[in-house]
């Protein structure tokens, strides 16, 4: 997968296995009280339990967007963002945390990907483990839109997964809009 994505012009990104709640959820505009966080039943780090700090201006900007929308034009989530909670250390629960880090420094236009080892508490059985991998990608450009995304997804399905037929259906994920599967 890595070789194929590189051959398609993507640059690889990666990040630490231990993350803060800030990068894992808050930077992705997932409010600290939201039920969407329940699906990210995380493994907490015992020692140390919290990061010393979160990089600025990221902390201030994200906190403002959660509180009242900041300068984005959004109303935000209208709650008191907890700057202590956001420093809580956890094992990475989703690959999108890598995208959040990358977006903070990415060049436009650009194509980026990461293959992320993730951890979530789950009952271990024949089809579930507590760790898994997610492939994450970002395409940045002035003209990029949903049609661009669907074109890339079709290319991945054919070039990487060997699909002969691709069908899109609307999907619901509480933290993305629009969503397709």
Write out the residue ranges for each language-model feature.
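TRNA-recognition modules of translation machinery and tRNA-sensing kinases, especially anticodon-binding
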Residues: 1-181
């Amino acid at each position: 997968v890595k070789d194929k994505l590189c051959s398609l012009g993507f640059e690889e990104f990666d990040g630490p296995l231990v993350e803060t709640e800030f990068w894992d959820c808050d930077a992705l505009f997932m409010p600290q009280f939201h039920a969407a966080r329940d699906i990210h039943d995380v493994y907490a780090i015992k020692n140390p339990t919290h990061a010393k700090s979160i990089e600025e201006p990221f902390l201030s900007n994200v906190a403002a967007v959660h509180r009242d929308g900041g300068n984005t034009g959004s109303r935000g989530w209208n709650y008191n963002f907890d700057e202590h909670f956001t420093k809580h250390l956890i094992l990475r629960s989703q690959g999108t945390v890598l995208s959040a880090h990358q977006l903070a420094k990415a060049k436009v236009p650009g194509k980026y990907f990461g293959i992320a080892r993730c951890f979530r508490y789950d009952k271990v059985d024949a089809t579930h483990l507590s760790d898994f991998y997610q492939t994450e990608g970002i395409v940045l450009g002035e003209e990029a839109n949903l049609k661009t995304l669907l074109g890339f997804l079709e290319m991945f399905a054919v070039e990487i997964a060997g699909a002969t037929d691709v069908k899109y259906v609307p999907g619901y994920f509480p933290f993305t809009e629009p969503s397709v599967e």
